[in-house]
Amino acid sequence: MGDTELELSPTHLEELQKSPSTSTTSSLSLPSSPSSGPHPLTSSSPSTSEGLPTSSPPLDVISEGLGELSLVIDTEVAKKACQEVLQKVKFLKGDGEVSSASSEPILANGTAHPEANDGGQPPKISEEEVEPIKSVRRRQKNNSSKQSWLLRLFESKLFDISMAISYLYNSKEPGVQAYIGNRLFSFRNEDVDFYLPQLLNMYIHMDEDVGDAIKPYVVYRCRQSINFSLQCAWLLGAYSSDMHISTQRHSRGTKLRKLILSDELKPSSQRIRREVPQPPPPYPPPLHHGPGMSEHSLSPSKRTHQRSKSDATVSISLSSNLKRTASNPKVETSQDEPVRLTPQREFIKSLMGIGKRLATLPTKEQKTQRLISELSLLNHKLPARVWLPTAAFDHHVVRVPHTQAVVLNSKDKAPYLIYVEVLECENFETSSVPVRIPETQIRSTRSVENLPDCGITPDQRASSFSTVPNYDNDDEAWSVDDIGELQVELPEIHTNSCDNISQFSVDSITSQESKEPIFIAAGDIRRRLSEQLAHTPTTFRKDPEDPSAVALKEPWQEKVRRIREGSPYGHLPNWRLLSVIVKCGDDLRQELLAYQVLKQLQIIWEQERVPLWIKPYKILVISSDSGMIEPVVNAVSIHQVKKQSQLLLLDYFRQEHGNFNTEEFLTAQRNFVQSCAGYCLICYLLQVKDRHNGNILLDSEGHIIHIDFGFILSSSPRNLGFETSAFKLTSEFVDVMGGLDGDMFNYYKMLMLQGLIAARKHMEKVIQIVEIMQQGSQLPCFHGSSTIRNLKERFHMNLTEEQLQVLVEQMVDGSMRSITTKLYDGFQYLTNGIM
């Protein structure tokens, strides 16, 4: 049976009005207890229309002159019903409650009866007072109906992580917040990870009930993953930095961060031997089980670790661990496996330290030389149980090809781009770390002693990342079978790769190729001839003022092939090449926010089948002034294009992709239009500023990609608000589209309209990402009280599609004719040399 409300019928009310009463009791309540107040008059017990057993003790009695009207309810049933209601939702406030301890009759609207104390006269309920009672009952019924619908929504398939975050942020009911916190376990890890900044920001800056709902999930995931633990620690530190120093020291975010970094959240049963794979821990006890939530829907992850071939025969050597401890006083003496977080933290700290030291050097040439030297020394600490957090697969870092690193363009700082060789593995936490392959086995090298000092002692060169040694003689390295494979394959590599790059010499990149014979298969010759017959994109010349241009222009696949041929690990089938940009002195929290909005809009446009193209790139926030960025491969800035080619954009397109009517040019033109429309909408919605040609990339397929979202929403360069147009649309962009009268330009405007209609259909998904991050934030993009309101207004929810079309036409026309865009480009050319 459904829920039944215990209420006075109209018949009973009429009898109360007509008949005198000797009782002043007009309340219906549970027997009072020391701690319990009045209870809502709702119950999930069966209907009382046919009466309950008279032998049960009465809950309360209403007696009126003509006889006694008894309402008898089983006490245990009533208590159980109230407990169920309180545990499920706790929505009702009990507007019609009456305290049984009071002798004064209280009406349903909460006011005392005016005749209650008048000479002991019985209370009378007038017709005017019946209406408020009825309205209260109607509200209670509506609330009950809303609760039912809310529970059905929470348990439906439509309830996704975006809705969960929204209810967690907006709900003020602890019961609902606890329920949502429990439901986090039922979502995929990747889906929750996308909203990790929002979850942790709510944990830091919102009330205690929200924090209590979020913490069990965060703690559980930290026990399962080193990578998740470190990302939580980094984000907690970054988002707590806006608090006052005295408050920050004792905040919940700081306490949780210290708990994570203390490594107290490691799995309860440490694996001393790795022959036996451990199943995932049991699902933690829920705070509030919701109806319909099955156990299988709440299991956090179905993936279990499956052993690699190396793990089958390898166990941790305790003597090896003790040996490491003796050589490194920082390592705590323990017979358990080494501290989980230390190697990765030391690796990231080393990369950040390089960036800080580069910023102190005056010229770009000195920065480049220092970068190559520092990275070559870093290689002596590899391989290790370290990884790049921006990658999408598990791996171990084995080598950094130092001669390929470049310093990027920056006026005051020294961001740099590195390429990282990794070996893909099944689980970087449990898979064996690869054995170090000395470079002398397969190539000629210069001795370590010939390296520039860079302020690093020989002892530091030989040391490793805290607990992770060089693994040359470590038991936890390769299995016997793996070593056998190496011994079989190494001679082949040695004889066929005589033109490999010298390890520490930039000059030998070109000199080694002519010194030794190269053996090439006939199939390779045929393949290279066919590739030469095809159209080959141009290359950039070396520019001492911009060394990154040549590296970024080189096709990615060609770079991978070249670096693999020169790597001692390149023969291994699980070898992969990754790249990352390291930034020091920059706050990447706004970049992370922009990435989330771009990713959400990309998903929306894909769902709505709008062919807009954007490229969100991953952002890793390490602290409030450092982080890592995923590079966009096969792309160079429009500034570099114009500087290197000295051509207009349309002429460069013809040079790269052929004449106007070729299939390659038409494909590149369509890619340009779809990406330009997508980023124009992004720039309008987020009010992206600082749109000079150094911050707009052009890839090998014709797409444009906007980078550097340091000025969005309420912030602008130097807070001047100089760029007033909705987005950047220059005459060169229009020329690539075929001119104002071309079909592709009309296609561009049509895509703008379709994209805006689709975006406003899902506006709340975008708004909540930004709104939650505004809590407790001191970021420049949130300056002013109207940031969120202005963002909502740019979705134009009140306009018809015809009015939206007029708006798009006006924005396009205004952006093309914007004088401030031309002035800002001129300002950047005069001050920074950006073309």
Swiss-Prot record:
Membrane topology: Peripheral membrane protein
InterPro entries referenced in this protein's UniProt entry, alphabetically: Kinase-like_dom_sf (IPR011009), PI3/4_kinase_cat_dom (IPR000403), PI3/4_kinase_cat_sf (IPR036940), PI3/4_kinase_CS (IPR018936), PI3K_accessory_dom (IPR001263), PI4KB-PIK1_PIK (IPR049160), PI_Kinase (IPR015433)
Tissue expression from the record: Expressed in the inner ear otic vesicles.
Domain PI3K/PI4K catalytic span(s) in chain numbering: 554-820
Keywords in alphabetical order: ATP-binding, Endoplasmic reticulum, Kinase, Lipid metabolism, Membrane, Mitochondrion, Mitochondrion outer membrane, Nucleotide-binding, Transferase
Gene3D superfamilies: Phosphatidylinositol 3-/4-kinase, catalytic domain (1.10.1070.11), Phosphatidylinositol 3-kinase Catalytic Subunit, Chain A, domain 4 (3.30.1010.10)
Comp. bias regions, Polar residues: 311-332
Major enzyme class: transferase
Catalysed transformations (reactions): a 1,2-diacyl-sn-glycero-3-phospho-(1D-myo-inositol) + ATP = a 1,2-diacyl-sn-glycero-3-phospho-(1D-myo-inositol 4-phosphate) + ADP + H(+)
One Gene Ontology molecular-function label: ATP binding
Domain of life: Eukaryota
Domain PIK helical span(s) in chain numbering: 59-262
Region of interest: Disordered: 1-61, 99-139, 267-341
GO CC terms: cytoplasm; membrane; mitochondrial outer membrane; rough endoplasmic reticulum membrane
Region described as Catalytic loop: 687-695
Region ranges (Activation loop): 706-730
Entry's Gene Ontology BP terms: cilium assembly; cilium organization; inner ear development; inner ear morphogenesis; inner ear receptor cell development; phosphatidylinositol phosphate biosynthetic process; phosphatidylinositol-mediated signaling; pronephros structural organization
Cofactor(s) this protein requires: Mg(2+); Mn(2+)
Deleted gene: phenotype: Knockdown of the gene causes inner ear abnormalities and audiosensory impairment. The semicircular canals of the morphant inner ear are unable to form the characteristic cruciform pattern, resulting in a lack of canal outgrowths and failure of the pillar to properly fuse. In addition the otic vesicles are smaller in the morphants than in wild-type larvae. The morphants also show reduced hearing ability, lacking the brisk startle response observed in wild-type animals at 4 days post-fertilization.
Compositionally biased intervals (Pro residues): 277-288
This enzyme's EC code(s): 2.7.1.67
Biased composition (Basic and acidic residues): 125-134, 267-276
Protein location: Endomembrane system; Mitochondrion outer membrane; Rough endoplasmic reticulum membrane
General function of this protein: Phosphorylates phosphatidylinositol (PI) in the first committed step in the production of the second messenger inositol-1,4,5,-trisphosphate (PIP). May play an important role the in inner ear development.
Protein family: Belongs to the PI3/PI4-kinase family. Type III PI4K subfamily.
Name of the protein in its database record: Phosphatidylinositol 4-kinase beta
Classification of source organism: Eukaryota, Metazoa, Chordata, Craniata, Vertebrata
